[in-house]
Amino acid sequence: MQEAAKISHKENFRLIDLSYSVKDTFLEDVAKGLSAKKKYLLPKYFYDLKGSQLFDQICETNEYYPTRTEESILRLAIKDILKCSGDITDIIELGSGSSTKTKILLKNYLRKFKVIRYYPIDVSQILITTSNRLKKEFPRLNIITIISEYLEALKYIKKNVKEPKLFVFLGSSIGNYEKKGIHSLLRSLSSAMSKNDMMLIGMDMKKDQNVLEAAYNDKKGITAKFNLNMLQHINDELEGNFDLKKFIHHSFFNEKESRIEMHLVSEQDQSVRINGFRKLFKLRKGESIHTENSFKFTEKIIKELFNASGLKEKKKWMDNKKYFSLRMVTKK
């Protein structure tokens, strides 16, 4: 796709919008998901403003270990990561989010180098707000914010950003895809990488089922609010008429697929209307809408995925419990 959508410049800040009409895409994705035999919604639509705030609250719960564990690994390994990445000064981050962990990277890279170019990529317009905050916190940082789906952004990066560069994919966000999707995205990343590029990727490891399920069913019910908020997001943006009181949050570990699944279960027979569609979307009592996966990795699976994607692990860092891993990989 052409970079024709929107480009704006400020001092040390550039915005590149490669997205199609966000509302049209949202509408198409929702209609497709609710029309499927097994209903689903895409997890990228969790993150409106309220959803992003709720996710930040989830990260503060006692049960949700991934964020604090990855952050602790990052703090302990940062000198090693800097050494490993050599003279790289271009950092491309997929799914920047609130950039809390990213700040650890940026702060330390800016201590080592006078100039750093940072390319955060996300489909959400909230990324613009996050980028502006980073610009205030790190005035020397050159920020090129890319509003886009990952695949389009990777094409842009491959064409416009010279090697060497560091791709960053934290939070085990790669695990939100189906296994085939994980493989496909890793292959796309590998294709976007040059021989001197590197990628720092966070991967959540398979562990005790009770620990996993507690992380996605916190006692305060914040994860439930986060899950239900996707329906509110549809109501707000697409003029849907979901009644959130008629759904309950349900998440569990699917051993066969090695993943946590999050669902919204209909508590009664009901019909939902989305503005722009004459069709009513019907749900039976007990029927669920699958909203998210969170794949949990093993060393064997990681090795297979990297090999099949043309990637090679250079180094890894883990916490003492081996709950989570950070891995530096290169192209084969």
Question: Where are the predicted features?
Answer:
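Core SAM-dependent methyltransferase catalytic element
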Residues: 264-267, 318-332
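Conserved class I S-adenosyl-L-methionine
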Residues: 88-97
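Substrate-binding/catalytic lobe of Class I Rossmann-like enzymes that use SAM or dcSAM, i.e.
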Residues: 213-295, 299, 303-309
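Class I SAM-dependent methyltransferase SAM/SAH-binding core
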Residues: 106-152
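A short glycine-rich, Lys/Arg-flanked "PGG" loop and its adjoining helix->strand segment in the class I
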Residues: 183-195
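N-terminal auxiliary segments of SAM/dcSAM-dependent transferases
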Residues: 1-44, 52
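Class I SAM-dependent methyltransferase Rossmann-like catalytic core
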Residues: 38-85
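Conserved beta-strand signature within the Rossmann-like core of class I S-adenosyl-L-methionine
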Residues: 192-206
